[in-house]
């Protein structure tokens, strides 16, 4: 997606892994592959930490364009900024919004050579019995609640009425160049980086809060290498019967590849484990 550029070469081998939270309340798995591309711009992060005695889960998918530099920077810095935020527990939405914006500002100030490099982000933060999903760009987040596929993020595309209006109000334009693009260049309307288009391509995340209860089964974060060829409902159906989230992530990746996805493919699956112990998720 986005700009075309030479990026990190890869041997084409998929990677996968996973883990379990210390409190046994959630497990996670990931799978990532360059797919049919010769280079890799996707990055992901899976982290379990502790803040004020609470077990915290942090998960993210970052799909770069114009190179891998911004996606790698966001992977390395976004969650560190978030965990250090003084309102991380008391006002998690504000902390997430601030962390997105400060990470973007720091990158733009630190590397003036990467004017046409950017990245999407789709992140999930587990705090107690709350799930916070935030995104910029088109790396989508889906939950399965009561067997139903529910999108908990909105793809930020330049042809959406509200996004196009925002861009034009800021003095920019949207035009068709194979797909709808900001300035005829970029296929997403919100992203990290993209210094030359920053006035129009903002990093304001949309944040959604969900309650972690017994109806919430699992979460999927993935780059558009999956969503270009697999529907939300298909992804949930494929994942629901696979208890091991790493195996579920691998299944999604393999299916996207089989369906001729032309992009890098990265999937993160988080499964919520509703045991017989404490009713809380801290």
Curated annotation (Swiss-Prot):
Protein name, entry field: Probable protein phosphatase 2C 45
Residues that hold Mn(2+) 1 according to the record: 63-64
Annotated residues for binding of Mn(2+) 2: 63, 224, 263
GO molecular function: metal ion binding; protein serine/threonine phosphatase activity
Keywords noted in UniProt: Hydrolase, Magnesium, Manganese, Metal-binding, Protein phosphatase
Catalytic activity: O-phospho-L-seryl-[protein] + H2O = L-seryl-[protein] + phosphate; O-phospho-L-threonyl-[protein] + H2O = L-threonyl-[protein] + phosphate
Metal-binding among keywords: yes
Keyword Acetylation on entry: no
Domain PPM-type phosphatase: 27-272
Cofactor: Mg(2+); Mn(2+)
Origin: domain of life: Eukaryota
Record-listed E.C. numbers: 3.1.3.16
Cofactor note: Binds 2 magnesium or manganese ions per subunit.
Annotated source species: Oryza sativa subsp. japonica
Any one Gene Ontology BP term: regulation of intracellular signal transduction
Entries under CDD domains matching the protein: PP2Cc
């Amino acid at each position: 997606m986005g700009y075309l550029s030479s990026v990190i070469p890869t041997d084409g081998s998929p990677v996968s892994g996973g883990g379990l939270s210390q409190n046994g309340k959630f497990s996670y798995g990931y799978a990532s592959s360059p797919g049919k591309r010769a280079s890799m711009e996707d990055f992901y992060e899976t982290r379990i930490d502790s803040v004020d005695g609470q077990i915290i889960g942090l998960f993210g998918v970052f799909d770069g364009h114009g190179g891998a530099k911004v996606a790698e920077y966001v992977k390395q810095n976004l969650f560190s900024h978030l965990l250090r935020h003084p309102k991380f527990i008391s006002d998690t939405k504000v902390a997430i919004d601030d962390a997105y914006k400060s990470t973007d500002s720091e990158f733009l100030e630190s590397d003036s050579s990467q004017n046409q490099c950017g990245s999407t982000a789709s992140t999930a933060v587990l705090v107690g019995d709350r799930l916070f999903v935030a995104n910029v760009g088109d790396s989508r987040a889906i939950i399965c609640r009561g067997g139903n596929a529910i999108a908990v993020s909105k793809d930020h595309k330049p042809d959406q009425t509200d996004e196009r209006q925002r861009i034009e109000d800021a003095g920019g334009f949207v035009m068709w160049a194979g797909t709808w693009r900001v300035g005829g260049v970029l296929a997403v309307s919100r992203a990290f980086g993209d210094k030359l288009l920053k006035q129009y391509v903002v990093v304001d995340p949309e944040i959604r809060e969900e309650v972690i209860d017994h109806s919430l089964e699992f979460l999927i974060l993935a780059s558009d290498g999956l969503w270009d060829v697999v529907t939300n409902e298909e992804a949930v159906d494929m994942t629901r019967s696979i208890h091991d989230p790493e195996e579920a992530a691998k299944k999604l990746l393999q299916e996207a590849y089989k369906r001729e996805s032309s992009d890098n493919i990265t999937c993160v699956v988080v499964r919520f484990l509703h045991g017989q112990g404490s009713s809380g998720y801290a």
